[in-house]
Amino acid sequence: MTGSPLPARERAIVLRKERLGGDHVRLVLDAPQIAPWTRAGQFVHVLCPTEASLQHFAEAKGRVLAPGSRLADSSHFPLLRRPLSVHRLCGPQYAADRLRAGPHSPSTTSWPRRCSGLELLLRVVGSGTAALAEREAGMGVDLIGPLGNGFSIAEEGQEAVLVAGGIGVAPLLALAQELRLLGRPVTALVGALDLARMPLGVDPQVDRSFADDQLEFMLREFGEIGVRSVLVSEREHGMLVTEYLERFLERKRHEPLVLYACGPKAMLAEVARLAGRRPCQVLLEERMACGVGACRGCVVKVRGEGRTRFRTVCKDGPVFRAQDVLWEEMQ
């Protein structure tokens, strides 16, 4: 279910920028038009170009560019907006001590929420994200949002299990906030190539806790809101997060669980397989242009009403039921 009736375009203001491990950057933004309506799993479409790149584009417009010239290389023109999941919401309702205590009265969980800030977590991979990572406190960021359909919240009595791979952890922190606001028990299983590239704060006892197979408050951002977590490092532990998930599900085989996942497609396909008949929602990440379903550049095949259908990740998703996605068709 989407948040606001219509997405808003807003010039959000950067309140703080944090450089994290592995080329990750966290931007804390003041976005009073978008933040109160944002639901976990939704995204904002961000205009990333620097003023310099736009100036170069304006100067080049209307003339033929020589092949091989710097301005002819489209990588220097991050003109398309970048879809970025909302990482965390900021406001009195989302204070860490309140989320640890949860649940809250219906009046505090209705829409719009009493918050005006949101956080974006990004990994610098190209010219667009590099330009966005250059924003400093006081500078503006052009956003459209909230966009897409977010997560459906676990029913009372179900434990929510969040499974993240790499930068896929970004939208799951906002989901953890939402679940804790309603008092749901939450466990986060987070996979990373190595500990140094983890974009969240890591407890120094992570290796001991992993060896003891104990779920502790190992990731700071999850722990401070009452979510137990385990960090699985492929390099340090020689294990994928899906392998740990299989072990975890075996221990919890008689307990009511609902799974949520975001990460590489191969990881999501394996999470869907391991989930079996358990309810499981996945957030898909696709390249997209318009962000509103018009260009149909981000379609995926899903099962629906007895036949295969094409759905857009930006408008129909980015969250889908794992059992509906035709994983064998995913590239």
Regions found by a protein language model. Name each.
Residues P171, K265-A266, E285-V319:
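Local cysteine-cluster metal-coordination motifs and their immediate loop/turn environment
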Residues T312-D316, A322-Q331:
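SAM/dcSAM-binding transferase cores
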